[in-house]
Amino acid sequence: MTLANIKSAKKRAVQSEKRRQHNASQRSMMRTYIKKVYAQVAAGEKSAAESAFVEMQKVVDRMASKGLIHANKAANHKSKLAAQIKKLA
C-alpha cells in the first residue's frame, strides 16, 4: 500500500521497493563473500584464503561498478584483506 495517488508515483513506489529488495540481496551476497575470506584468514589457510579473495574481488568490484557501494569502499575491503592474507606467510 502506498500513499501515492498519481499513477506514476505509484509505479515509482513499486519500482523503488523492488530495487531496494534487490540491492539488499546483492549487498548480503557481497558481505557473505567478504566473510568467507575473513574465515579462511582466521583459520590460517593461506591458499584457501587466496582463492576466496579472488572470488570476493570480482563480486566487490562488480558492486562498485554498479554503484551499490562506493569505489573507495571496495578498495578498502580489497586492500585490508590482501594485507591480512599476505601476513599469513
From Swiss-Prot:
Keywords annotated in UniProt: Ribonucleoprotein, Ribosomal protein, RNA-binding, rRNA-binding
Protein name per its UniProtKB record: Small ribosomal subunit protein bS20
Species: Haemophilus influenzae (strain 86-028NP)
Top-level lineage group: Bacteria
Pfam families per the UniProt record, alphabetical: Ribosomal_S20p
Protein family according to the UniProt entry: Belongs to the bacterial ribosomal protein bS20 family.
Gene3D superfamilies: Ribosomal protein S20
GO biological process terms held by the UniProt record: translation
GO cellular component terms given for this protein: cytosol; small ribosomal subunit
NCBIfam families: S20
Function: Binds directly to 16S ribosomal RNA.
Region of interest called Disordered, as start-end residue ranges on this chain: 1-29
Molecular function per GO: small ribosomal subunit rRNA binding; structural constituent of ribosome
InterPro entries documented for this protein: Ribosomal_bS20, Ribosomal_bS20_sf
